[in-house]
Structure formats: C-alpha cells, structure tokens
Design a protein with these regions (language model features):
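Short, solvent-exposed loop/helix junctions and linker helices
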Residues: 7, 32-35, 80-83
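Conserved C-lobe activation region of Hanks-type protein kinase-like domains
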Residues: 19-75
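Protein kinase-like catalytic domain
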Residues: 49, 67, 94-97, 108
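Conserved C-terminal C-lobe helix
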Residues: 80-94
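Terminal C-lobe "cap" of eukaryotic-type protein kinase domains
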Residues: 96-100, 106-120
Length: 174
C-alpha cells in the first residue's frame, strides 16, 4: 500500500500540513486545499518585505509556533512604508484556519497592490458615501464611524498612511 504525504519546506508549511491533513478525500482525514499555498505565500511575502524575517520566528521554532499560531508581524512596521496593508494581507494569508485565508484572486485584489490613483478613488468613494448620510438625526453608520474614529485611525489620521500616498493625495486634491 502506498501512502501519500504532503511535502513542503520545514518552517514554511501550513498548520494543516503539520497536523497530517490528507491529500486524498477517501482516507477519512480532512483534506488539504489550495490554502496551504496561500499560507506559504504569506510567509514568503513577509520574508521579502522584511528582508529575511519570518512571521513565526527562527528556523527551529517555526513549526511549533505555526501550530500554536504564535505570529509576530512587528518586523513589518520597521520595514518601511505600506506596512498597514501588507500586515493585514499577510495576517489573512497565514490565518490558522484554512477557510479563513483568502483565495489567490482575493490576494491579487487586496488594497496592498492598489496604485495611488485607486487608493484615492476608494477614499473619495467612501467619503462621498458618508457625505450622503443623514446628519439629523445621524444615521447608524455615521454614528458608528464617529464613535470608532479614533480607535480606527488614531488621533492623527495622516499617520495611518505612508508618505508617498499622502504626497499623491495632495496632488489629486490640488
């Protein structure tokens, strides 16, 4: 009898690979999906953006940390601009539950990959949407935005955007 075991490089494998999920649906085990590739891609993206880092730590501790979902993405903030979108995307990609990970097409459409024009257009659309909401009495969405504003963007909204984006924003609004 031949058994099929999933491969992969130590420290870069999804938790379901480490837990022994199956390549085949007929052996009674949970089946592996393409989400294993998304997990690995998330780790590789982190590696590239941090110039050698890994979201689950050093080589010999990675697989235990992957199984325990002990993620540390703090190295991204030190790697430069565009880290908010990158961190959000990578966290989705390395989610411990396969069904919580985005598909490849969802990854490709993520705001991390948007150019400045698309980002500004999105913000304008959102802003325009809130401009049309009832102010007296305020709509539920507007109340929710006002209540949560500081926890979402902090005391200075400009700090939530990278320098290049803010420069482009100034060009679009001029």
């Amino acid at each position: 009898s031949q058994s099929a075991q999933a491969g992969g490089t130590m420290g870069w494998r999804a938790p379901e690979l480490l837990q022994g999920f199956s390549l085949h649906a007929d052996d009674g085990k949970e089946r592996l999906t393409r989400a294993v590739d998304i997990f690995s891609l998330g780790c590789v993206a982190f590696y590239m953006l941090t110039r050698g880092g890994h979201p689950f730590g050093e080589l010999y501790e990675r697989e235990i940390r992957i199984l325990q979902n002990q993620v540390d993405t703090s190295a991204l903030s030190a790697s430069g601009d565009d880290t908010v979108e990158a961190e959000a995307l990578i966290k989705q990609m390395i989610a411990p539950i396969p069904s919580d990970r985005p598909s490849a097409s969802d990854v490709a459409r993520h705001p991390f990959f948007w150019n400045a024009a698309k980002r500004v257009a999105f913000l304008q659309d959102v802003s325009d949407r809130f401009e049309t909401l009832e102010r007296a009495p305020p709509s539920f969405a507007l109340e929710l935005l006002e209540q949560s504003a500081e926890s979402i963007v902090g005391p200075d909204w400009r700090r939530r955007f990278d320098k290049n984006f803010l420069e482009d924003l100034g060009k679009f609004l001029s």
